[in-house]
Amino acid sequence: MIDYVGSFLGAYFLGFALFYGIGFFKSISNRII
């Protein structure tokens, strides 16, 4: 159960970090251009 919850939180955090990173990269690229 702990491993399942840990993997779920890890995947959720990774997806959130990826989404936030893409939005941050888009904002920087738009600001430069």
UniProtKB/Swiss-Prot annotation:
Transmembrane segments: 5-25
Cellular location(s): Virion; Host membrane
Entry keyword Membrane: yes
GO cellular component: host cell membrane; membrane; virion component
This protein's record includes keyword Transferase: no
Chief location: virion
Membrane-topology descriptor: Single-pass membrane protein
Keyword set, alphabetical order: Host membrane, Membrane, Transmembrane, Transmembrane helix, Virion
Domain of life (superkingdom): Viruses
Family membership: Belongs to the inovirus G9P protein family.
The protein's role, per its UniProt record: May initiate with G7P the virion concomitant assembly-budding process, by interacting with the packaging signal of the viral genome. The assembly-budding takes place at the host inner membrane. In turn, G7P and G9P are present at the end of the filamentous virion that emerges first from the bacterial host.
Name of the protein in its database record: Tail virion protein G9P
